[in-house]
Amino acid sequence: MEVWTLKSLRWKIAIIIVGFILVTGTVLGGVNYFSARSILEDEIYNRQTQVALLLVQGIEDKLTQYQRILATMAEVAEIEAMDWDTAAPYLEEKILALKDFEIFYLVFPDNEFIGTEGNSGNLGDRAYIQETWSRQKGIISEPIISKATNVPVVAITAPIRDAEGTMIGILGGTLTLDFLTEMALDIAEGQAGYPYIIDDSGLVIAHPDASIRFQANFLNTEADYVTPELAAMTQQMVAGEQGLATYSLEGEEYLCSFAPMPLTG
């Protein structure tokens, strides 16, 4: 079975995660901010750091697990045959068993693909497909919009090889980004406030409110929901800074601890 080394896996995850920031926010409500900050600052900062590290490790473990699964699947006879009628029953069984995956698909040498949702098309313009061919190794993509379902996903690939070891195709699978939010909420369960994740453009990737994910950008100062304080804090975040800040949103004041948490450490 062909798998990545930890170094190369972390490098790819860093591309996906680089600029993602875990934020833990605590509502101050009627508590006097200045006294609350002196009491809560260390507690919130330490809690945020712990939650962020747990989340990063959890994401790494999850993606490592799924990359290994895909690499193993790419070596079974049904996939190596590079025939959709042969592969389809096997992949349809796997999609039922592996609930986090949205679809599985085969990519042929001309970059045409067929997926378990009955979808097809050409993925030649996708950077992660090009990189899989050029490196002849599995890839984890940055967050993208799925051509098959039009929802935000992360794609995982594994090379398909013939008996001589020549790469003849690609096995791909897409994960919806819901697992990021679910993992963040599970790790933060029982704590005051909630975590969310943004990318290095300010776009919200994971958030308890599903309507915000991939819709809200906290650098978009023209949006009603982005206050000057929130935009300023987000600027610090995407610059890779770490610290504490306050902002008001919908009548509530939040004390936030934030830090960049790329998986490379």
Predicted ranges, named:
Residues D162-A163, F179-T264:
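Intrinsic low-complexity, intrinsically disordered coil/linker regions enriched in small/polar
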Residues V3-S38:
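Extreme N-terminal signal-anchor transmembrane helix of membrane signaling/transducer proteins, especially
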Residues N46-L53, I59-P143, T149, I187:
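Extracytoplasmic/periplasmic sensory segments of membrane signal-transduction proteins
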Residues S141, T157, T174, F258-P260:
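Sensory input modules used in signal transduction
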Residues T166, L171-G173:
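Sensory beta-strand/linker motifs that couple input domains to effectors
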Residues M1-L6, I139, P143:
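N-terminal sensory and localization modules of signal-transduction and trafficking proteins
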Residues A148, G173-M183:
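Helix-start (N-cap) segments at beta->loop->alpha junctions
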